[in-house]
Amino acid sequence: MLKLGGFAVSNYYNKVKVALLEKGIRFEEAFCMTSQDETYLKRSPMGKVPYLEIDGRFLCESQVICEYIEDTHPGIPLYPKDALERARVRELITILELNMELVARRLYGQAFFGGTASDETKKQVEKELAKGVRAFKQLAKFSPFAAGEALSYADCAAGVHLPLVSLSTKIVYGRDMLDDCAPVKPYLKMLNERPAFRKMNDERKAATDAMAAAKAKKG
């Protein structure tokens, strides 16, 4: 059985998790945090989450894992058959991750962990993120899914990344930068009504609450 390593608060972990759930693939979850420990680096050379264990062998990087899952478990496809449409799904994922989530991540310290982002950082992020939101709005079809009529890996990515972009910008800037893309809110509501997304989100919330309680207990 496949084993997914990571923790339920991680959006990249949850991207893979919800894909596995949507495809009906049996898997185990192995709790672990990011680490530079030598033993852990044998599983994930950059020390990140998630990783996937396959019969004692390991893969890292969420998109690589998704590609492997699709190649080995094609029964419930999360990529279209047409080559161009498959590329469009990957295009959306790239915009979501490189031009939105990783840009907004520079705000997470202030938004979620009690840190402070410099005025220069906030200014740069706001400018770069506006471009990412514009690109996503242009490319996403919302008919009803991001890439068209069928659920795809683009939705697995959007469902875990967009809420973080939304919340972090609302906290730091006092406005949700995803408001510039009106279809996003009903789209996310639609995704979150799916059993796989609901299960992933329920377990994410439980893990978030547990981490907050543990932190409060420490002091």
What are these regions (language model features)?
Residues M1-K131, S143-A146, K217-K218:
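GST-like domain detector, emphasizing the conserved glutathione-binding G-site
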Residues L96-E193:
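GST-like fold's C-terminal all-alpha helical module
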Residues R204-G219:
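Acidic/histidine-enriched, glycine/proline-rich intrinsically disordered or flexible terminal extensions
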Residues E29, E149, M200-N201:
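A generic structural-conservation signal
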Residues R105-R106, N201-R204:
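Short coil/turn segments at secondary-structure boundaries
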Residues R88-E91, P186, K199:
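Short, solvent-exposed alpha-helical surface patches in well-structured domains
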Residues R194-P195, M200:
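A late-sequence structural motif
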